[in-house]
């Protein structure tokens, strides 16, 4: 449950952002700006276009006797935004900083596992979110990160 609650990551996120800026400097700044755009684009399109268009019910709505660990969300199930956002971020980070690939993907997989464990998503919701997020992460790397680097690097 720890892995699925956003408020558990605020301080860690700030610490990671500062560390990225200190270690990677200009590339770190370009990454953080691109990450903000990536998550905004991915989260909005995944929710408002895919979820609202596909309208797949969550397991807790289809199986009412399912014993829930956390409250069942009222939003639709496919794709998982947690999976989509973490894979978008992991893909972007892996492309920007090759030495972070294992850690980034491991974190994304852990978040994805938590969504199935908590019974709020089907495995196919996770797979769809991971694929979509990876695609968005790659496209943002190719079209946003590289342009930001050209703009801010002397």
List each model region and its residues.
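Hydrophobic, aromatic-rich transmembrane alpha-helices
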Residues: 13-23, 86-91
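Interfacial segments of alpha-helical transmembrane regions
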Residues: 17-44
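N-terminal transmembrane-helix/juxtamembrane module of multi-pass inner/ER membrane proteins
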Residues: 1-15, 46-75, 152-154
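Membrane-interface junctions
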Residues: 2-9, 25-26, 86, 96-99
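Alpha-helical membrane-inserting segments
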Residues: 41, 45-50, 136-144
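Membrane-embedded catalytic cores of phosphoryl/pyrophosphoryl-handling enzymes
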Residues: 67-154
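Alpha-helical transmembrane segments of integral membrane proteins
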Residues: 11, 30, 34, 99-106
